[in-house]
């Protein structure tokens, strides 16, 4: 019994040679691509660090006052605003001439003049925007550059209004157990009211505590 090997199954030496030569080329190519990916990692980290540093600088930099709303200009650049300042100061100085230099009215007018100058200076310093009439305008569109014009005073107003209401409520509750509570509403009990006034400064905490306890709202009126 004999075996016959077909001629097409015999490997060509040239093909073996080319096969052995192609292996290192492909492996060399693989090594180069691996080096490139590993070297790109530090570069990406450097780019990310630079982006973070740049964003922190931009966020920490103060924003200048610009005319970002149609028809309004920064008060420090408004001619009508400067004209109003001169007119008010001139009016006060003309009234000052009617009194002796060291008299009480003269001292009051001098203080008023300094107060007027300081007020106009603060309007220009804090970036308020003025209209064509030279008057500052409050911006209430939520822009962070104008929070100090509306949101901060608004929160302060709500706190003061809540403090007044809380103190009055606490006083009425305190005198409700008296024999003649109506008389204490007409003639205020000053010592009791003084104690309640100072306790009223923490009214947000006290209101939250009563809300949790169920005492904030009367159950039966």
UniProtKB/Swiss-Prot annotation:
Record GO terms (molecular function): mRNA binding; protein domain specific binding
One GO biological process term: photosynthesis
Keyword annotations: Chloroplast, Membrane, Photosynthesis, Photosystem I, Plastid, Thylakoid, Transit peptide, Transmembrane, Transmembrane helix
Annotated SUPFAM superfamilies: Subunit III of photosystem I reaction centre, PsaF
Gene3D superfamilies in UniProt: Photosystem I PsaF, reaction centre subunit III
Annotated localization: Plastid, Chloroplast thylakoid membrane
Membrane-topology annotation of the record: Single-pass membrane protein
Plastid as UniProt keyword: yes
Family (UniProt): Belongs to the PsaF family.
Role this protein plays: Participates in efficiency of electron transfer from plastocyanin to P700 (or cytochrome c553 in algae and cyanobacteria). This plastocyanin-docking protein contributes to the specific association of plastocyanin to PSI.
Note from the entry: Plants lacking PSAF have altered thylakoid structure and are not viable.
Identification of the protein by name: Photosystem I reaction center subunit III, chloroplastic
Species name: Arabidopsis thaliana (Mouse-ear cress)
Source organism phylogeny: Eukaryota, Viridiplantae, Streptophyta, Embryophyta, Tracheophyta
Gene coding for it: PSAF
């Amino acid at each position: 019994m004999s075996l016959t090997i077909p001629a097409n199954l015999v490997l060509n030496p040239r093909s073996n040679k080319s096969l052995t030569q192609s292996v290192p080329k492909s492996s060399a190519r693989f090594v180069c691509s691996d080096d490139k990916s590993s070297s790109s990692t530090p570069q990406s980290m450097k780019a990310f660090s630079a982006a973070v540093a740049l964003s922190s600088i931009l966020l920490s930099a103060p924003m200048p006052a610009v005319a970002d709303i149609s028809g309004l200009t920064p008060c420090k650049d408004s001619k009508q605003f400067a004209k109003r300042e001169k007119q008010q100061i001139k009016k006060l100085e003309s009234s000052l001439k009617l009194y002796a230099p060291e008299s009480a009215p003269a001292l009051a007018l001098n203080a008023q003049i300094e107060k007027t100058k300081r007020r106009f200076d603060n309007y220009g310093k804090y970036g308020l925007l003025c209209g064509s009439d030279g008057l500052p305008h409050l911006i209430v569109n939520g822009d962070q550059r104008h929070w100090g014009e509306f949101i901060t005073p608004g929160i302060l107003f709500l706190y003061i209004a809540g403090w007044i209401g809380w103190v009055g409520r606490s006083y009425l509750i305190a005198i409700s157990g008296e024999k003649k509570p109506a008389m204490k509403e007409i003639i205020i009990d000053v010592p009791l009211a003084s104690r309640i006034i100072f306790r009223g400064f923490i009214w947000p905490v006290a209101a939250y505590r009563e809300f949790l306890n169920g005492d904030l709202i009367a159950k039966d009126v």
